[in-house]
């Protein structure tokens, strides 16, 4: 009996040019069938017409559902890809902004460094121009310190002489 249903279902699908699933789905339609010796099914015209209209409606509905599902899937894939591309674009825009800020910062630092180099060169030139005066100050300082030493020695010697003179005077 199951073999008869599967063969009748496949024969219906061949006669109606419907996929086997559709023929099985509409197999619940009440149709009077007579088998001929070759295993083909014969039906009356009205039942066959009802089967065709229900089968085509089901096939059309399945095709419509499939198209709608595909459209929704493509829309969601499009949204996903647009989101990914937008995120990548925003990442690259952020990187570009960071690169521009870094470039500006390095330009600013380069300008500051050049300014510092110029200032240091000027200070070095001033130091070189003051060098003879600094050497003269060092020589004067040495002279002052040797004069101070001489003054201390003279003071000590004068105190000695004063003490000797006082001793001689007392005698």
Curated annotation (Swiss-Prot):
The keyword Cytoplasm belongs to this UniProt entry's keyword annotation: yes
Pfam families: BLOC1_2
Ranges in a coiled coil: 135-155
Compositional bias (Basic and acidic residues): 14-24
An example Gene Ontology CC term for this record: BLOC-1 complex
A GO molecular-function annotation: gamma-tubulin binding
Similarity comment: Belongs to the BLOC1S2 family.
Subunit structure: Component of the biogenesis of lysosome-related organelles complex 1 (BLOC-1).
UniProt name for this protein: Biogenesis of lysosome-related organelles complex 1 subunit 2
Organism: Nematostella vectensis
